[in-house]
Amino acid sequence: MSSRKKVRVLLLKNKTVPIDKYELECRSKAFEPIFVPLIKHTHVIQDFRNVLNTIPNYLNTINYIIITSQRTVESLNEAIIPTLTSEQKAALLSKTVYTVGPATANFIRRSGFINVKGGEDAGNGSILADIIIDDLSTDIKACPPSELLFLVGEIRRDIIPKKLHSKGIKVREVVTYKTEELSDGFKRFIHAMKECDEDEVFSDWVVVFSPQGTKEITQYLGDSNRLPGSHLRVASIGPTTKKYLDDNDVTSDVVSPKPDPKSLLDAIELYQRHK
């Protein structure tokens, strides 16, 4: 048996198929990735269909779409776009799409959208809203501000709509997927934690991507439960998640500078080198 100590990274997320870039980035750094699903996603197409059915020629009345989740892109690709006519599909893919983070931006481009904005320049919803406001203030097609179609999950934050509404920009939110917490999520997490042999593992990293499904896990990770000398470390995908952890007495040892695999794993690797 190799005496080399391992660095395991427990990713509190569903594994993206066919390729998960967090897994690839972990393995490129000789970290062992372990996925711990906490929620399940279900496509929702009825809201989108209702808009198309009740507003004549709707896709030709808008110029902009907001997408902030890869789950929305999956729902578009797997459940919504296949139901569209060729004309509707062409109209949809011709829109300018605003999004958060490079991973989602790349996914959107692979789906056939050509004009994608935000992406790596927008690390969170607040920054993306500022980009949209700035763009629309100089876009003659948006004067007066046209309605933006915001494709969302059943559970979402209201940062973007609030900022846009404050500037008189209309936003129509349409649900494209819903999420449910897995009843055995905490059990999966504990099982993953107990799999390690402390003589071999140099450290375990728990990466938190979202508050959903993490109530019991945050209690487990709470500062009061982390003993001095513990090999357990916590990373958050960004400042919003860090605040959630702070509010639940969980210290983030690392906060990813950007919500993407390379930024996250580079930050963890840097921490490992200096600790």
Swiss-Prot record:
Segments forming a coiled coil: none
GO molecular function, a single term: uroporphyrinogen-III synthase activity
Gene3D superfamilies cross-referenced by the UniProt entry: 3.40.50.10090
EC assignment: 4.2.1.75
GO cellular-component term (any): cytosol
Catalyzed chemical reaction(s): hydroxymethylbilane = uroporphyrinogen III + H2O
Keywords from the named record: Heme biosynthesis, Lyase, Porphyrin biosynthesis
Family, per entry: Belongs to the uroporphyrinogen-III synthase family.
InterPro entries assigned to the protein according to its UniProt record, in alphabetical order: 4pyrrol_syn_uPrphyn_synt_sf, 4pyrrol_synth_uPrphyn_synth, UROS/Hem4
Protein name, UniProt field: Uroporphyrinogen-III synthase
SUPFAM superfamilies with a match to the protein in the record: HemD-like
Species classification: Eukaryota, Fungi, Dikarya, Ascomycota, Saccharomycotina
Any one GO biological process: protoporphyrinogen IX biosynthetic process
Further details from the record: Present with 1360 molecules/cell in log phase SD medium.
Role according to the record: Catalyzes cyclization of the linear tetrapyrrole, hydroxymethylbilane, to the macrocyclic uroporphyrinogen III, the fourth step in the heme biosynthetic pathway.
Keyword Lyase annotated: yes
Enzyme class: lyase
Known pathway: Porphyrin-containing compound metabolism; protoporphyrin-IX biosynthesis; coproporphyrinogen-III from 5-aminolevulinate: step 3/4
Organism: Saccharomyces cerevisiae (strain ATCC 204508 / S288c) (Baker's yeast)
